[in-house]
Amino acid sequence: MVSAVFHSPLEASAPPVTSTHSPIGKAMSKPQTEAPAAPVVSARPSAASRDFRGVWMAVLPPVLGLACLVLLWQLIASTSNSGIPKPAETWAQALEVFSDPFYSEGPNDQGIGWNVLASLQRVAIGFGLAALVGIPAGFAIGRFEFLSRMFNPLISLLRPVSPLAWLPIGLLVFKGANPAAIWTIFICSIWPMIINTAVGVQRVPQDYMNVARVLNLSEWKIFTKILFPAVLPYLLTGVRLAVGTAWLVIVAAEMLTGGVGIGFWVWDEWNNLNVSSIIIAIFVIGIVGLLLEFALIKIATLFTFEEVKS
């Protein structure tokens, strides 16, 4: 016989009783306390620290490089008998030179500011003429194989010629120092624009030209819709190289032609044995060239071509 045991509803609803004598019961009877969570530290640096690091890495290396240059300059000037002035002496001379950079006491006695402006004017004229001739010539040479085979040997022959070799030709033909200097800038700065533009045209994908041929596009449409957008990064690279070449050439040309210009100013200071002014002119020439390069890079980055930005 099976006997059944019935519990009342009150007994069923009562909570279970745990013995406090057992270890489990003691543990359950004690109040549970949680340890405070450790603060979470982000492994990523903050935006402010990243910005500071970026500025620090952008400023510190150039400053250290300039400091090394000044230190080397000081050591050479102190240990040798070459007559090179020390940095402090050159700095004092620079303060005097730039106290009135635009004075004018005659056609051959002008401040360094007027000389730099005269050189920049010649560079602008010579470079502008070179761009007007060199860029279209580069497109034509790159577009037509016959012209490429025709002019490539001439470019390879004339491009390595020194600027000083072109200057006497300019003096002979133009009968003047200023046109001869502009001619020298023109003939020396035209080659980078021709070569880079032609290379850019030749590297346009052939599929683009095949599509243009299927659509029966005119040469003008091919130039404006296909060639120019594709060649623009190469063209801008050629322009940058040409400006640097033009600025290098004008200094050498003005040393020989005389008149007003930063090259003539350097040569005149050498005749006066003013070495401090020559060193100042070297820094001025470098800074102006750096500014020209920076301006062209900013112009190039206005376009969305990765080749230009890199």
Residue spans for each PLM region:
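Transmembrane alpha-helical segments of polytopic membrane transport and secretion proteins
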Residues: 1-67, 294-310
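Generic hydrophobic transmembrane alpha-helix motif, especially the helices
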Residues: 156-192, 199-200
